[in-house]
Amino acid sequence: MTIFILLAVIGAIVQFWVPVNYSMVDYLPENAPSTTAMDVMEEEFDSAVANTRVMVQDVSVQEALAFKEDIAAIDGVNDVSWLDDAIDIRTPLEVADQETVETYYKNDKALFTLEIEEGKEVPATEAIYDVIGKDNAMAGDALNTAISQQKTGQETFNAAAILIPVVILILLLSTRSWFEPVLFLTAIGISVLINLGTNIFIGEISFISQSVAPILQLAVSLDYAIFLLHSFDDYRKTDSPEKAMKRAMKRSFPAVTASASTTFFGFLALTFMDFEIGADLGLNLVKGILLSFLSVMVFLPALTLISYKWIDKTHHKQWLPNRYPIGKFVTKLRIPALLLVALIIVPAFLAQNETNFIYGMGDNPDNTRAGQDENAIKDAFGKYTPIVLLVDKGDLARQEQFVDELSELKYVKSTVDYTGAVGTGIPPEYLEESAREQFFSEHYSRIILNTTTDTEGDAAFALVEDVKEVAANYYGDDYYATGESFTLYDMKQVVQEDNKLVNVLTVVAIAAVLLITFKSLSMPLVLILTIQTAVWMNLAVPYFTNEPLVYIGYLIISIVQLAATVDYAILFTEDYMNNRQEMPKFEAIKKTINEKIFSIGVSASILSSVGFIMWLTSTDPIISSIGILLGRGTLLAFTMVVIFLPALLVVFDKPIEKTTWRPNFYKRK
């Protein structure tokens, strides 16, 4: 017990030294084309792809140049580009190419593009706000990263501040002692703190793991502690505290092990993702489940035996009944339930794959400055997503033809390269070195496409494929392309492949645990069908409501919901199988529903509360989407377990008996 407390204290302290990574791009595989291109560009050129746009209103050209100089002087800001980098502003703007002019300067509004160094997003964006004031605007990927850094920790704290009282209330309503919730939360809280501390050995964690893993660990593993203490309470009626705890541990160990195993192996599947945010979250959750299991089976018994007198002194009447006589009613619904699910399951499966997915961070809410600024810049200058290409610098004639063809592509507004800005008639050696370095490195020539698509979506990804096709025609595989749309295109390819892999791994792993637990060939099919249908229904909702869904949230929840809520089906089915040995199937299912709906309801209410609180407290689109999917998915899983699963167990009673080793089902004499 002392060791657990000591480790928890150490974990609580060292967690603040664990770096948090807020960049989704860093979690792409190293061999992703856009990642390789970014690495090459950083080696060859001093500046990277522009990741921020700043708009200043009501300024002259000279005033805009002054703003440009002030912004460029900020630490962490590189390569500020404006109109003077595209044309000679000493000549009247009226005689210049108006499309080029209006890309940077329009209706007395100046639009700058710049790159903010990774790791300096927060101080740099704050300094830019100081320079431009509250009436001007800033948007871009670097700003989104800065917002995540500033808000994630505070929003996680806010979620915990709401969640813990809610969980305590649920536990108080479902137990008979004021002190028992303290034991539950202490045992799991200790394991959460240890888990946070062990991240120091990983090196860094993603902001998603920081936000989601501790809360999810708490919600999923509270069941283990509840089951142990409820067993302890039962044995206390006849045995001494020490003997009661031994019997409770013996009784609880198989059930808690089975429950933890399904969750453990489900979360373990996430670690096989190539998109390493999933692997990062999976590792954190796997560690969390293992530590929670150890805490419940080692730390909680010792803590309970020390403090059981406080349980006795703080007894109160049970405010909610633990039996609900609804089994007879639910049993009558078995055929309608089966028919309804049969009608829903195929459309739900198809719809959940056809949702409008977002692969990046999504848009900032309109009620935030970032969201309003983004809209203001789009309204004034339109959409802007730069694409950067690196090609062999030895053949300017070929490059000129290449750029001309790129310029003809839909959504390409303008291009910036040597052949367009200077011309093939002037040798690069005639330019000053500082000017030449804007276009050439030692090995490559740089071409920038200013496009008018969003960073992702059908139009953006179609343009990516068109650019790839044109580049391949001119340079084969000897080119590099990057930019946010290219990065998100790669992310889409990676996570879609991950989705196929981890879903198969999750189902196979959980099916194996269920096969061992129930010694039955049919039970894994019955239980996984029940929960997987709830998963498909949950993920189909955004399609029918026409709401975009962040794909990483979709992918994580498709695994987490199955792994976390299959425990409800296990608990229900174990009790049913025991009852079925003593009575006919209808009596067994009614008794199981009456007795288990309360305990399953407590678990589901805690997990769904976690989801809805994450949804309500987070402004991050990824965290928020995980929250709403978890909350809604848990309620759907609960509904399926108490209505659809009983129907399956009753209707397929004979096949279950024949495919189960020694079921010992009750036979009428």
Question: Which residues make up each language-model segment?
Answer:
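Membrane-interface helix-loop junction between the first two transmembrane segments
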Residues: P19-Y27
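Structured non-transmembrane domains adjacent to transmembrane bundles in polytopic membrane proteins
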Residues: E30-T52, V56-A142, N356, G362-M523, ...
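Membrane-embedded transmembrane helical bundles of large multi-pass transporters/channels
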Residues: M1-V20, G119-F357, A472-K669
